[in-house]
Structures are given as C-alpha cells and as structure tokens.
Amino acid sequence: HLLSEALGLSSTGRDCLLCYRELVHALIRSGVYPATAQAVYGLALLLERGILYQPPVAPAMWRQLNLQLSEWAEARLSLAYGEVASPRARLIEGVLCMLGLPLGVGQGNNPTCQSARALSMWAYNDPDYLLQMVTWAARDDEIIMHFEGQPISSNESVSGVAAELPMDLDPVSLIVVPHLDRIYAEMGRRCIGREGDPHRWVNPEFHGWWSGRGFSINVDVATGKLCEVDTFIRHFYASYHPYYNGNQPLIHPQPAGIAVTDSAARFIGWHAITILRASLDPNDVMRIYFYNPNNDSGQDWGDGVKVSTSGNGERFGEASLPFEQFTSRLYIYHYDPLERGELATVTDEELERVKGFLNRSWGATRLPSTDLQADPGPR
C-alpha cells in the first residue's frame, strides 16, 4: 500500500503492481538510487500503462535485470553519466523511463530523428521488441535487422547518418542509437539506383510491420519540385481524416516526413515524425496529434502555423496542429495499400487553404514551372 501511494498509482497501476510485485521490487532494488531518481517516475508510468500484462514483457524485464553489459556499453554509460550509479542501474533507469514515457524520447543535438522515432514507436507499440533491441546492443555490441529478407549487421555497416557518436542522449538511446543509425543508413544505401524516395522501402522494414506499405510523396525526387499535390492531399484525407475514412481511428502509429519551417515560414529541412491519431479538439477543430523527436515540439513554423503541446486535447508528450496546417507541412506519409483507396472529396475551399499554407512556406521555391511560351503569332 505504501509503495502504491508513493508512486501515485491509480487503480490500474495498483493492480499491475499487485500482479508483478516481485518484479517491481527487483526493479527498484536494481535501478532506483538517488542518482537515478527519474526511474521512480518511469516505473510509475510503466505500471499505469499496464504493459506488464503483455505476455513477453515481464520475462523480458527479468532478462534486463540480469543482463551482462559489454565493456563498450559500460564505458559509454560511465562516460556520459559518471560513476555515481552503476552502468547497469543507469540502463534500467533508461528502460523504465522509455517504457513509461514513450513519447519522451529525444534525439538530442544529433541528426538521428529516424532512430529516435523508432525507439519511441517500439516503446509505444511493441515494448518487448524494444527490450530485445536493448539486449542485443548492450550485451552483444551488435544489432541485426533484415531488409527485404537480407540481414544487416550494425557492425558491418560502414557509417550512419551521424558523423560522431552522439552523447547527449538518454541511457537507452546512448547504447542503441549508434547501431540503429548505421543500419538505417545501410538500408538507404541498398536503395541506391531505385527510382523515387528510399523511405518508401526503408521505413516499413526499419520501423515494423505495422508501417503502411503504401507510400505517398508530393516532391519529385529528381527535381525537388512539388508534384501531384492535389492527389497527395486528397489521399491523405481519405486515409487519416475521420470525416473521410469512415470514422476509422488510426490503429498503429505511422511514420511520416515533414518539411520543417522557421517562424518566417522558410524551409529548414526534412524531419521524421510519427502520426499518432486524428481527433476533434475541445473546440471541435479536427487536429493531427503527432510525436516529434526533436526535444522542442512547441514550435512556430511561420504563417500562423504554431505547434501546440497542451490545451488542445494533447495527451502527455504529443504535439498537434489543425488538420489543414499539418497537411501543408507534410511531404511523406504511409498508408495501407489494401484499404479502399478512393480520393477524399475534399471541398475546393479546404484544398485551397492547405495549398495556400504550402505555397506560402516551404513550397514557395518548389512550384513546378508552367512552361508557358509566348504565342509566335500569325506567319
């Protein structure tokens, strides 16, 4: 009773604590120290999520408690966090926090948004798979994933997106991201020579089976110009907007790519995010709620597009935008190709509003040329 009160648990968390009392006590003994106080918060939220009821998770947590860390993993954790707590305790703290706060994973000051997104997605949607990744990276110094049936070893991949080993990360990311980054880059290299954007093939293989195999992009890869914008928008509405998809909620989180802009609506770069859900906010405005791994979700993207993190129906860790504004910054999304694919009958007014936000921001310099020629006149 005292423990559940100290953790501030609801009836859900208390029931989970009662069912897995021995495991929880072992996690506290191994991972909670004055230097790892955040583990308490992570543990409380893990119990509130009820994920220990998933059959593989509790055995995987016992494995984590007894995991023998490699010398490389111990050195990385000690270098980043010091010697006040053991590397094992630091990693347990990191696991508890990532499983308790899956939308709190950050990429730090590193170009590793794809890897951060994958860790968040696994913690959110497939926690035992995340624990398997942690085991491989921390114990074996190697992760092997498959791309179109062929194995890719993180040890055999040449290099990743990040030029240097990132250090400003949580304990799990510190150990796992270097491996994921190299594998992600290798998957991209295996797409060289294919026509189109490599994310079409990489994202479903890298993130998980639930990532839609259907793929839509509104930028011509060869020229960088906008292409088929109307179809792109109508298909996105048909796939994600409750008013156009039969009021079907999003079942699994989906990877997507956005064109990030600054407060003057100028293009900064491409960025990986996760679409979590679409729903009406308290003011009856349809919004997209998403996860942004860049540690700064509440950003001003210019032209009145201001990302919200609270006050508009966001759950903890979510960012959100009105559906139209989000669509205007979107350049890649996935969908299930087996779903009915009729384009949404979006009104011309709404379509023009989305295109207006697009053309006034990152699309301003990407408008396709019209190739108009002057009439030579009569001869």
Predicted regions span which residues?
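A residue-identity detector for tryptophan
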Residues: 62, 72, 122, 136, ...
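Long amphipathic alpha-helical scaffold segments
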Residues: 4, 11-105, 111
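Glycine- and small hydrophobic-enriched segments that form the cores of compact globular domains
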Residues: 75-186
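Papain-like cysteine protease catalytic cores
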Residues: 136-246, 250
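Generic low-polarity alpha-helical segments
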Residues: 23, 39-40, 58-64, 185, ...
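Hydrophobic, Leu/Ile/Phe/Ala-enriched alpha-helical segments that form helix-helix packing faces
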Residues: 65, 69, 117, 121-122, ...
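Active-site signature of cysteine proteases
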Residues: 17-21, 218-379
